[in-house]
């Protein structure tokens, strides 16, 4: 009994010491924040005194104050007010106008304020007690008395409802109050359904439907004007990038007491750019993705997009990110903001990746990067211990390059690029100069979803030759059965003979004879033959200008779009019979097939950098690179035009995109 008593006493003392230690650490974090407040410290102490008798609200206040350093606002909101007011004026006078006409007017205003650069200041130095108290009280009402957040525990409440703003530089105003009156259509009706009255999922769907109906937003890939942080103005903007609408949605949803956060991937693993979206914390404890004002919770949200990492924006500081900034001389921009956490495993199967980097980097930070079409972009970081670095929860079936950064910001590879396979293996790309291969390259970029649909209009198309202008009799030269989004070269037999009229004919319904490029070459000289363009007149009314001549203008981004769904055609009358030895054609697509006349350069990764395998001009619809090392990672660049380019490997005679 004595031994058991001593053991229990020891456990109690140990637990007490841990609690005291944690309390002291929390108090230290709070005191550090109060010290950073400077002359604004009395405002924050007033908040703490106000909640002295309410333990839970006091903890909420401490949470906000502890994590406030690093959150920023404009030092003087009056500096940006004239800009916001002019935007409001345009949105009022141009209500009902075409969204792109509105955009052009707003771009002019943006140019007028090109020199606007207001100073930033940390919230801890300017926030007022009354504002913070009102925010805390309002958030608690939404948590405890509204219908859609009662399932949250205190920690969840602190992140999903409590924060006094949704993003940096958002004005410190009474947004909860004025947004609460914004189109709460049908939300109150949920109280009449016992199944749905407490459903955060259904409330989010209902409110998001209202947002879409009110805003009808047009998504753009790039910002058209400087960010607008005043919510009353932002709610009226008819266009923007995904981050504009997701950040706005957080404030609108939280004003109604619906627990919503923002998730993002800093860089797609398979193409350029990154993406942001929302999540709602539903009653079963799961986060359900959606996109504010554009797609609802429960609808598939980019399910086939390959991601390397996913993070969630938080109000609380991430100690790992804070430590990173304290240790490293240079931190890439993606990781300078310390308010997000890793949630990759909520979205995909992922595994840790261990890499040997050598002893000389012990104690440094390494980064995992993915390719964004032009350069490697960091998506994760980890501390190097000894000669190894372990990256946690990494997405699979994607190519990565481990790097570190020099003090001046120069990126340096610390290993080979590698594929993280579905089998959870790390497969490095190492050029094998003892084993060589000839590369036949057909494209510089993978075929994405929006391209696949239109290229199928090439299916069943036919090439004919005839000496009859009406093609009552003709030779069938070629029938399209493979709808790959590449150019095709067709070599004709010597026995074919000469014909005056040559055409592409599309019998299939729904094809509209879509074709981007056709070129005929004389057998004897090998030169391109040009004649009078003949075929179906006109074009589809929804695509003016896309007449039959577009198939012969040498531009892969223009195409013939016939006025009839089937049995249209386009071709050439050479004025006399011509012996054509070959022809090439490219279907409607994205312009990323090999384009005759363009200059290209093939690069491959070797010894920490890209090495050139040579530049050449495309003479046909493919490029041949002979005597190339096997097992390398390649990158084909179009030096003449375009931006879309992608890394690939070469396997079984084909380009495999990463």
Regions found by a protein language model. Name each.
Residues 1-28:
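Bacterial Sec-dependent N-terminal signal peptides
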Residues 350-359, 444:
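A short, amphipathic beta-strand motif
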């Amino acid at each position: 009994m004595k031994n058991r008593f001593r053991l229990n006493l020891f456990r109690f003392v140990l637990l007490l010491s841990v609690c005291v230690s944690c309390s002291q650490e929390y108090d230290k974090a709070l005191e550090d924040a109060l010290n950073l407040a400077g002359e604004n410290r009395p405002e924050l102490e007033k908040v703490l005194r106000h909640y002295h008798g309410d333990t839970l609200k006091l903890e909420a206040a401490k949470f906000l104050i502890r994590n406030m350093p690093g959150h920023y606002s404009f030092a003087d909101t009056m500096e940006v007010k004239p800009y916001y007011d002019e935007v409001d004026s345009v949105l009022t006078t141009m209500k009902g106008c075409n969204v792109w006409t509105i955009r052009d007017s707003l771009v002019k205003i943006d140019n007028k304020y090109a020199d606007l650069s207001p100073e930033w200041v940390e919230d801890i130095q300017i926030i007022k007690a009354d504002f913070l108290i009102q925010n805390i009280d309002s958030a608690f009402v939404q948590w405890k008395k509204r219908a859609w957040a009662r399932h949250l525990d205190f920690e969840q409440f602190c992140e999903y409802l409590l924060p006094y703003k949704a993003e940096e530089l958002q004005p410190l105003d009474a947004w909860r109050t004025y947004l609460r009156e914004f189109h709460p259509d049908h939300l109150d009706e949920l109280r009449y359904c016992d199944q749905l009255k407490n459903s955060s999922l259904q409330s989010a769907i209902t409110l998001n439907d209202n947002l879409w109906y009110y805003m009808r937003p047009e998504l753009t890939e790039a910002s058209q004007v400087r960010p607008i942080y005043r919510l009353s103005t932002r709610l009226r903007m008819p266009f923007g990038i995904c981050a504009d609408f997701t950040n706005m949605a957080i404030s609108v949803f939280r004003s109604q007491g619906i627990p919503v956060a923002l998730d993002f991937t800093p860089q797609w693993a398979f193409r350029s750019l990154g993406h942001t979206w929302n999540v709602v914390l539903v009653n079963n404890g799961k986060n359900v993705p959606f996109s504010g004002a554009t797609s609802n919770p429960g609808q598939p949200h980019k399910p086939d997009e390959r991601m390397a990492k996913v993070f969630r924006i938080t109000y609380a500081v991430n100690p790992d990110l804070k430590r990173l900034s304290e240790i490293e001389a240079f931190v890439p921009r993606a990781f300078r903001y310390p308010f997000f956490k890793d949630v990759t495993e909520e979205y995909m199967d992922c595994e840790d990746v261990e890499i040997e980097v050598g002893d000389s980097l012990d104690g440094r930070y390494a980064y995992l990067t993915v390719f964004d079409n032009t350069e490697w972009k960091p998506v994760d970081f980890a501390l190097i211990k000894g000669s190894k670095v372990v990256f946690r929860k990494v997405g699979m079936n994607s190519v990565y390059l481990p790097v570190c950064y020099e003090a001046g910001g120069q990126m340096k590879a610390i290993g080979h690029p590698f594929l993280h396979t579905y089998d959870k293996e790390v497969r490095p790309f190492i050029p094998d100069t003892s084993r060589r291969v000839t590369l036949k390259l057909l494209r510089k970029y993978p075929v994405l979803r929006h391209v696949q649909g239109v290229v199928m209009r090439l299916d069943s198309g036919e090439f004919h030759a005839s000496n009859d202008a009406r093609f009552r009799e003709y030779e069938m030269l070629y029938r399209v059965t493979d709808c790959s989004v590449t150019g095709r070269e067709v070599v004709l037999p010597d026995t074919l003979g000469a014909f005056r009229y040559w055409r592409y004919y599309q019998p299939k319904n729904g094809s509209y004879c879509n074709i981007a490029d056709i070129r005929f070459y004389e057998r004897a000289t090998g030169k391109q033959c040009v004649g009078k363009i003949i075929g179906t007149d006109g074009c589809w009314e929804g695509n003016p200008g896309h007449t039959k001549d577009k198939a012969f203008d040498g531009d892969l981004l223009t195409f013939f779009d016939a006025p009839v769904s089937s049995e249209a055609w386009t071709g050439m009358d050479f004025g006399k019979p011509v012996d054509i030895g070959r022809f090439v054609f490219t279907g409607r697509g994205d312009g990323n097939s090999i384009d005759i006349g363009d200059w290209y350069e093939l690069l491959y990764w070797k010894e920490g950098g890209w090495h050139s395998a040579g530049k050449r001009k495309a003479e046909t619809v493919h490029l041949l690179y002979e005597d190339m090392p096997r097992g390398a990672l390649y990158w084909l660049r179009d030096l003449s035009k375009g931006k879309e380019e992608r890394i690939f490997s070469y396997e079984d005679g084909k380009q495999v995109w990463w």
